[in-house]
Amino acid sequence: MDIHVLNHPLVDHKLTVLRDKNTPSSTFRELVSELVMLEAYEATRDIEVVDKPIETPVAPMIGKHIAAPAPIIVPVLRAGLGMLDGMTKMIPSAEVGFLGMKRDEENPTQQITYANRLPEDLTGRQCFLIDPMLATGGTLVAATHYLAERGAKDITAVCILGAPEGLKFVEENLDPSIKFKLVLCAVDEKLNDKCYIVPGLGDAGDRLYGVID
């Protein structure tokens, strides 16, 4: 498993404001989008490109163009939606699928799938899974398996925060035949007894969109 944790003062600054409990939802949403754009630079480092002949105002040249079929960005609902704008700004030619998963509160490593809007065949597609929090790792593993069942073999996960327990679970439960990369802004200390990341930032979905009882 290829893990990349961003090391940049701008990321550290924005992440500190994001974590602050006094940061309002409007600012929180803007910061998530900005952080994802910074992550996308690393996440797309190995994106497939092809030669493209063009003419500049001065001379013809061979440039680069994102290869077909187009990459697909898959936000894990609902918190992953907050990351979608940043990713599509960086890869505007990408298609977007949606995957609704939530943690089983009685068994945190098990997931409940409640929505799916994805192509049936993902063979040959580069997939970018986006979900702000990698806590237990259960959602990420389940989502990766879900894409792999549809033929995906090249998956990059983009998360803002991770916990050591989640990283360990992902590494132990991923299908080794999948080319998998994980990009994070930071890895925090641990999970608490409610499986929240510590120090973390709270519930990302609630902070993005407000609490839903």
Swiss-Prot record:
It catalyses: UMP + diphosphate = 5-phospho-alpha-D-ribose 1-diphosphate + uracil. Catalyzes the conversion of uracil and 5-phospho-alpha-D-ribose 1-diphosphate (PRPP) to UMP and diphosphate. Allosterically activated by GTP. GO terms for molecular function: GTP binding; magnesium ion binding; uracil phosphoribosyltransferase activity. Pathway: Pyrimidine metabolism; UMP biosynthesis via salvage pathway; UMP from uracil: step 1/1. It comes from Bifidobacterium adolescentis (strain ATCC 15703 / DSM 20083 / NCTC 11814 / E194a). Gene3D superfamilies: 3.40.50.2020. This is Uracil phosphoribosyltransferase. Belongs to the UPRTase family. Coiled coil: none annotated. Uracil binds at I197, G202, D203, A204. The keyword Cell membrane does not apply. 5-phospho-alpha-D-ribose 1-diphosphate binds at R78, R103, D131, P132, M133, L134, A135, T136, G137, G138, T139, D203. Its EC number is 2.4.2.9. It comes from the Bacteria. One of its GO terms (biological process) is uracil salvage.
